From Swiss-Prot:
One of its GO terms (biological process) is translation. Keywords: Ribonucleoprotein, Ribosomal protein. GO terms for cellular component: cytosolic large ribosomal subunit. Part of the 50S ribosomal subunit. Contacts protein L32. It comes from Streptococcus suis (strain 98HAH33). This is Large ribosomal subunit protein bL17. Pfam families: Ribosomal_L17 (PF01196). Belongs to the bacterial ribosomal protein bL17 family.
Length: 128
Protein backbone atom coordinates (compact mmCIF):
# COMPACT_ATOMS: atom_id res chain seq x y z
CA UNK A 1 0.00 0.00 0.00
CA UNK A 2 1.03 3.60 -0.53
CA UNK A 3 0.41 4.68 3.04
CA UNK A 4 1.74 3.78 6.44
CA UNK A 5 -0.32 1.42 8.56
CA UNK A 6 1.31 2.61 11.80
CA UNK A 7 0.70 -0.77 13.45
CA UNK A 8 -3.06 -0.28 13.73
CA UNK A 9 -6.25 -1.41 12.09
CA UNK A 10 -7.86 1.01 9.65
CA UNK A 11 -10.46 2.31 12.12
CA UNK A 12 -7.85 2.84 14.84
CA UNK A 13 -5.53 4.56 12.37
CA UNK A 14 -8.27 6.91 11.13
CA UNK A 15 -9.25 7.79 14.71
CA UNK A 16 -5.62 8.47 15.63
CA UNK A 17 -5.14 10.69 12.56
CA UNK A 18 -8.31 12.64 13.41
CA UNK A 19 -7.15 13.14 17.00
CA UNK A 20 -3.62 14.22 16.04
CA UNK A 21 -4.93 16.56 13.34
CA UNK A 22 -7.34 18.18 15.80
CA UNK A 23 -4.58 18.51 18.41
CA UNK A 24 -2.27 20.15 15.89
CA UNK A 25 -4.95 22.64 14.83
CA UNK A 26 -5.62 23.55 18.46
CA UNK A 27 -2.04 23.69 19.79
CA UNK A 28 -0.25 24.58 16.51
CA UNK A 29 2.65 22.30 17.51
CA UNK A 30 2.81 18.73 18.82
CA UNK A 31 5.51 16.16 19.57
CA UNK A 32 4.90 12.72 18.09
CA UNK A 33 6.74 9.93 16.34
CA UNK A 34 8.31 10.73 13.00
CA UNK A 35 6.06 8.29 11.10
CA UNK A 36 2.91 9.78 12.61
CA UNK A 37 4.11 13.31 11.88
CA UNK A 38 4.70 12.46 8.23
CA UNK A 39 1.26 10.88 8.00
CA UNK A 40 -0.75 13.67 9.65
CA UNK A 41 1.00 16.28 7.52
CA UNK A 42 -1.25 15.26 4.61
CA UNK A 43 -4.48 15.54 6.58
CA UNK A 44 -3.55 18.88 8.12
CA UNK A 45 -2.69 20.26 4.68
CA UNK A 46 -6.13 19.16 3.43
CA UNK A 47 -7.92 20.74 6.39
CA UNK A 48 -6.13 24.08 5.98
CA UNK A 49 -6.90 24.04 2.25
CA UNK A 50 -10.58 23.49 3.12
CA UNK A 51 -10.33 26.35 5.61
CA UNK A 52 -8.93 28.62 2.93
CA UNK A 53 -11.83 27.78 0.60
CA UNK A 54 -14.19 28.85 3.34
CA UNK A 55 -17.48 27.91 1.69
CA UNK A 56 -20.26 25.89 3.30
CA UNK A 57 -19.32 22.64 1.59
CA UNK A 58 -15.69 22.97 2.73
CA UNK A 59 -16.89 23.65 6.27
CA UNK A 60 -19.00 20.49 6.19
CA UNK A 61 -16.12 18.39 4.90
CA UNK A 62 -13.78 19.72 7.58
CA UNK A 63 -16.42 19.21 10.28
CA UNK A 64 -16.72 15.57 9.25
CA UNK A 65 -13.01 15.04 10.00
CA UNK A 66 -11.99 17.46 12.76
CA UNK A 67 -13.16 16.56 16.26
CA UNK A 68 -15.62 18.87 18.00
CA UNK A 69 -13.20 19.94 20.75
CA UNK A 70 -13.07 23.30 22.51
CA UNK A 71 -9.92 25.10 21.40
CA UNK A 72 -10.18 28.07 23.75
CA UNK A 73 -12.59 29.32 26.37
CA UNK A 74 -12.70 33.00 27.28
CA UNK A 75 -14.65 34.60 30.09
CA UNK A 76 -16.79 37.57 29.12
CA UNK A 77 -17.34 39.77 32.18
CA UNK A 78 -20.05 41.85 30.53
CA UNK A 79 -22.36 38.88 29.98
CA UNK A 80 -20.95 36.81 32.85
CA UNK A 81 -20.53 33.82 30.53
CA UNK A 82 -17.80 31.76 28.96
CA UNK A 83 -17.44 31.91 25.21
CA UNK A 84 -15.72 28.98 23.58
CA UNK A 85 -14.26 28.39 20.15
CA UNK A 86 -14.02 24.89 18.71
CA UNK A 87 -11.14 23.53 16.68
CA UNK A 88 -13.24 23.94 13.53
CA UNK A 89 -13.93 27.59 14.33
CA UNK A 90 -10.23 28.17 14.96
CA UNK A 91 -9.38 26.53 11.63
CA UNK A 92 -11.69 28.79 9.62
CA UNK A 93 -11.31 32.05 11.56
CA UNK A 94 -7.67 32.08 12.75
CA UNK A 95 -5.52 29.55 10.90
CA UNK A 96 -6.84 29.77 7.32
CA UNK A 97 -6.42 33.58 7.00
CA UNK A 98 -2.74 33.24 7.98
CA UNK A 99 -2.11 31.08 4.91
CA UNK A 100 -4.13 33.09 2.38
CA UNK A 101 -1.03 33.87 0.31
CA UNK A 102 0.60 30.43 0.68
CA UNK A 103 -0.41 27.57 -1.63
CA UNK A 104 1.25 24.48 -0.13
CA UNK A 105 3.29 23.22 2.85
CA UNK A 106 1.59 24.76 5.83
CA UNK A 107 3.48 22.49 8.25
CA UNK A 108 7.08 21.91 9.27
CA UNK A 109 8.54 18.69 10.69
CA UNK A 110 11.59 19.01 12.93
CA UNK A 111 13.35 15.80 13.93
CA UNK A 112 14.30 15.49 17.60
CA UNK A 113 16.20 12.97 19.66
CA UNK A 114 14.82 9.41 19.90
CA UNK A 115 12.19 8.62 22.50
CA UNK A 116 13.52 7.29 25.75
CA UNK A 117 12.48 3.71 26.35
CA UNK A 118 12.08 2.33 22.84
CA UNK A 119 14.32 4.71 20.84
CA UNK A 120 11.54 5.53 18.39
CA UNK A 121 12.45 8.47 16.14
CA UNK A 122 10.54 11.52 17.36
CA UNK A 123 9.59 14.74 15.62
CA UNK A 124 7.89 18.06 16.28
CA UNK A 125 5.26 18.96 13.73
CA UNK A 126 4.13 22.56 13.72
CA UNK A 127 2.24 25.03 11.62
CA UNK A 128 4.58 27.32 9.69
Amino acid sequence: MAYRKLGRTSSQRKAMLRDLTTDLLINESIVTSEARAKEIRNTVEKMITLGKRGDLHACGQAAAFVRNVIASADYDEATDKYTSATALHKLFSEIAPLYADRTVRYTRILKTEPRRGDAAPMAIIELV
